[in-house]
Amino acid sequence: GISKEATIYLLEQGVRVTGTDAWSWDAPFSYTAEKFKKTKDPAIIWEGHRAGMVQGYSHIEKLNNLDKLPSHGFKVSAFPFKIKNGSAGFVRVVAIFK
């Protein structure tokens, strides 16, 4: 997973949207749960996500077909589904080619 520090570093470089084809941006929860049992530190839970409390950004998980994209030369748009009173939700992500 991506740590809070690594996420903040990306944001400091000008990144405003992150995405992954993995289940989560953070470390697998089984790993985090084991680490939490040892440290009792709540800051390690969803630490990559918590970077958004320091500096706002948008994040997309569970992307697919990334292997079909070229290394550059396209734009990405995300079309969210409206969810009443939600703080997160589904988006349809598309790559736009010239």
Regions found by a protein language model. Give the residues of each.
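Active-/binding-site microenvironments in catalytic and ligand-binding cores
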Residues: 1-98
